Amino acid sequence: MGKRLNSKHKIDRRLGVNLWGRPKSPINKREYGPGEHGQRRRKPSDFGIQLMAKQKLKGYYGNISEKAFRKYYEEASSRRGDTSENLISILETRLDAVVYRMKIVPTVFSSRQIINHGHILVNGRRVSVASYRVQEGDVIEVKEKSRQMPLILEALQSHERDIPEYITMDLAHAKGTFLRAPKLEDVPYPVQMEPNLVVEFYSR
């Protein structure tokens, strides 16, 4: 099993896309993958296209492990309705995804870090598990003593991202309410995500 990448720049380079739409992505400077000159491009197979769609979605949410990601797919497929839409809804209820959407932090990786370090409360109680599943109506906030962290202050003042409609935010108190699990069209992905191809990958 290969080592999981935990660097946003390394993931961008591996996939060849600016996954989070960040100005400092190495993809903005060149159009080839890792290595001195990248790899010669070939027409991808159906499998390759499906695999890339899966890797993009996994990578976007902080390079979730294959074991965890497959469990999300299995849960999505067991629910009523469209499996691809269900998968997006599940991923967007992860606590690290919600904290990232709230603009409390600049990246999903830093979101995971401040959660693991105990800086986040859900309904007034500390939650230190990044994969914790947020429910409709949950209130997520930064601990009062942690609100002056430079990382958090800079992220809250940034104009790089917008807060989606399925979260209401009190920026002054670094507090937000999760209104509902979104559909694909509601999620502000900076690159095209194709969860339908992820479903095809696992359905082979």
Curated annotation (Swiss-Prot):
Biased composition (Basic and acidic residues): 28-38
This protein's UniProt keywords: Ribonucleoprotein, Ribosomal protein, RNA-binding, rRNA-binding
Protein's GO biological process: ribosomal small subunit biogenesis; translation
Domain S4 RNA-binding: 93-156
InterPro entries named in the record: Ribosomal_uS4, Ribosomal_uS4_bac-type, Ribosomal_uS4_CS, Ribosomal_uS4_N, S4_RNA-bd, S4_RNA-bd_sf
Superkingdom, taxonomy of origin: Bacteria
Coiled coil: none
GO MF, any single term: structural constituent of ribosome
A Pfam family the protein falls into: S4
Region annotation (Disordered) ranges: 20-46
Keyword Ribonucleoprotein: yes
One GO CC term on file: small ribosomal subunit
Complex and partners: Part of the 30S ribosomal subunit. Contacts protein S5. The interaction surface between S4 and S5 is involved in control of translational fidelity.
Function: One of the primary rRNA binding proteins, it binds directly to 16S rRNA where it nucleates assembly of the body of the 30S subunit. With S5 and S12 plays an important role in translational accuracy.
UniProt family annotation: Belongs to the universal ribosomal protein uS4 family.
Protein's name according to its UniProt entry: Small ribosomal subunit protein uS4
